[in-house]
């Protein structure tokens, strides 16, 4: 089934792309959530008009992402946890905890965009990548210290 994407969808395409997907995926997920519309002639003509608006929207979201990256990279994250004598944490620091810290500091970031290969289980300083935008990423400096 051919669809025109209304939102960026990871592993599928960008806004305005015409993609071919399984009918069930289209009927049960993309169409009901408003993430895509059917690729008919009428919608294709509307797409041409919408592409100009989409270009503006992409530029605006890219600028917002760059501003967010500047704020993120200026921020120093210090998390305190109980730790054993060898610096091993009781528990771990996850992307959820980092997202909660950012939210407390006025930056709303989805935890899925914070890329941790595995939870942090030792004291120390870490660089944590964040997927802010498909074209722009940031690196957070996370320091885990003993409580």
Curated annotation (Swiss-Prot):
Presence of the UniProt keyword Methyltransferase in the record: no
GO terms, molecular function: rRNA binding; structural constituent of ribosome
Gene Ontology CC entries for this record: ribonucleoprotein complex; ribosome
Keyword RNA-binding listed: yes
The organism's place on the tree of life at top rank: Bacteria
Keywords: Ribonucleoprotein, Ribosomal protein, RNA-binding, rRNA-binding
Family from the record: Belongs to the bacterial ribosomal protein bL9 family.
Function per UniProt: Binds to the 23S rRNA.
Name of the protein: Large ribosomal subunit protein bL9
């Amino acid at each position: 089934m051919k669809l025109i994407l209304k939102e960026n969808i990871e592993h599928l395409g960008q806004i305005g792309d015409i993609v071919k997907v399984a009918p069930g995926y289209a009927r049960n997920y993309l169409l009901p959530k408003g993430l895509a519309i059917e690729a008919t002639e009428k919608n294709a003509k509307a797409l041409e008009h919408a592409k100009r608006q989409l270009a503006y929207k992409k530029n605006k979201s890219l600028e917002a992402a760059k501003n967010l990256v500047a704020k993120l990279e200026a921020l120093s994250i210090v998390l305190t946890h109980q730790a054993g004598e060898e610096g091993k944490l009781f528990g771990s620091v996850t992307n959820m905890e980092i997202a909660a810290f950012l939210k407390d500091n006025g930056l709303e970031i989805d935890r899925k965009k914070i890329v941790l290969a595995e939870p942090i289980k030792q004291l120390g300083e870490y660089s944590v990548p964040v997927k802010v935008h498909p074209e722009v990423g940031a690196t957070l400096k996370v320091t885990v210290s003993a409580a």
